[in-house]
């Protein structure tokens, strides 16, 4: 049997070798995972990845020592800094090293997910007890009453009238809920090796990053493109997405000038468009063009009304002087 020092040295050599040989490290949670699941995951990752467990204090020392070495690789120090900043080497976690796509490893982990009954103190997901016959005798209605579940007796069996949510995300399972779910043969939990973070080619992806879907990324890109196009349109910068609206706006302005000045341009049916704009037969551009046309004739008439008033005031003022 090797000594403790020898075992630690061999473990350090293996961990450093994995950190050097593989470009991707998956930090995985091992809470409530059984030894058989770990064995199955190791077997499923064979040829694709290496799965390493161990004391986190020892792992942290090895990673720090590797980063401080004179011949340290460029990614050694950033990896150590990220591990310290996000406290990655802590708790009940394991390390999976791979050069393959992350999706290949997560598919292996998902393939070894195991159903489990509710346990007292566990933090669950949403659990709904469905309506219908339970197969339980009327003497056991107290379990349902404790959880405010409406029941009735039908054909000598307890029947749930309407479905009832008994657990929500963040709740802790109490004795009554755990007992009832076991009697109803409901196993609401799934335990598996769960990916917490991923270090891939010098970039750390947190759990929130990993939860993003392709639809979410596509939505963000479309919103960004829309904002850029709106800024370009507002600033008058022609782009492939703004050149069309800019040409339409320019043509509307030309049509408005045509209506206001009685000038008819021959191109693009200018005469017909001008008449249609005056008669209010154009949608959008017609109303925009008609407004300047209506405002233009009104201006001279207003000026004509103001001129006599000014002349009257001048005459009154001169008469007062003489």
From Swiss-Prot:
Keywords: Phosphoprotein, Ribonucleoprotein, Ribosomal protein. Residues 307-316 have a biased composition (Acidic residues). Pfam families: Ribosomal_60s, Ribosomal_L10, RL10P_insert. Residues 292-303 have a biased composition (Low complexity). The keyword Ribonucleoprotein applies. GO terms for biological process: cytoplasmic translation; ribosomal large subunit assembly. Phosphorylated. One of its GO terms (cellular component) is cytosolic large ribosomal subunit. One of its GO terms (molecular function) is large ribosomal subunit rRNA binding. Residues 292-322 are annotated as: Disordered. Transmembrane segments: none annotated. It comes from the Eukaryota. P0 forms a pentameric complex by interaction with dimers of P1 and P2. Belongs to the universal ribosomal protein uL10 family. Ribosomal protein P0 is the functional equivalent of E.coli protein L10. This is Large ribosomal subunit protein uL10. It comes from Leishmania chagasi. The gene is LCP0.
């Amino acid at each position: 049997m090797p000594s403790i020092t020898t075992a630690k040295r061999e473990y350090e050599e293996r961990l450093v070798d994995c950190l050097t040989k593989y470009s991707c490290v998956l930090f995985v949670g091992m809470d409530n995972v059984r030894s058989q699941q770990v064995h199955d995951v190791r077997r499923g990752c064979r040829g694709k990845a290496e799965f390493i467990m161990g004391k986190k204090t020892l792992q942290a020392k090895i990673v720090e020592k590797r980063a401080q070495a004179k011949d340290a690789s460029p990614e050694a120090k950033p990896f150590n800094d990220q591990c310290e900043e996000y406290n990655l080497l802590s708790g009940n976690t394991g390390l999976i090293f791979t050069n393959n796509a992350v999706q290949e490893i997560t598919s292996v982990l998902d393939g070894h997910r195991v159903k489990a009954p509710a346990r007292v103190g566990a933090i669950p997901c949403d659990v709904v007890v469905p309506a219908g016959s339970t197969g339980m005798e009327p003497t056991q209605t107290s379990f349902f009453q404790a959880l405010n579940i409406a029941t009735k007796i039908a054909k000598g069996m307890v029947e749930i009238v309407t479905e009832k949510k008994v657990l929500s995300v963040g709740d802790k399972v109490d004795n009554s809920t755990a007992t009832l779910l076991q009697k109803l043969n409901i196993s609401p939990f799934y335990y598996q090796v769960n990916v917490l973070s991923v270090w891939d080619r010098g970039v750390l992806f947190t759990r929130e990053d990993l939860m993003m879907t392709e639809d979410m990324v596509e939505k963000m890109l479309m919103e960004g493109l829309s904002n850029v196009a709106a800024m370009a349109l507002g600033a008058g910068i022609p782009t492939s997405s703004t050149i069309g609206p800019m040409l339409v706006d320019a043509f509307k302005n030309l049509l408005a000038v045509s209506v206001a000045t009685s000038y008819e341009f021959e191109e693009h049916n200018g005469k017909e468009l001008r008449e249609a704009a005056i008669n209010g037969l154009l949608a959008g551009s017609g109303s925009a063009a008609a407004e300047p046309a209506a405002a233009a004739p009104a201006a001279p008439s207003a000026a004509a009304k103001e001129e006599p008033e000014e002349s009257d005031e001048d005459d009154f003022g001169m008469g007062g002087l003489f």
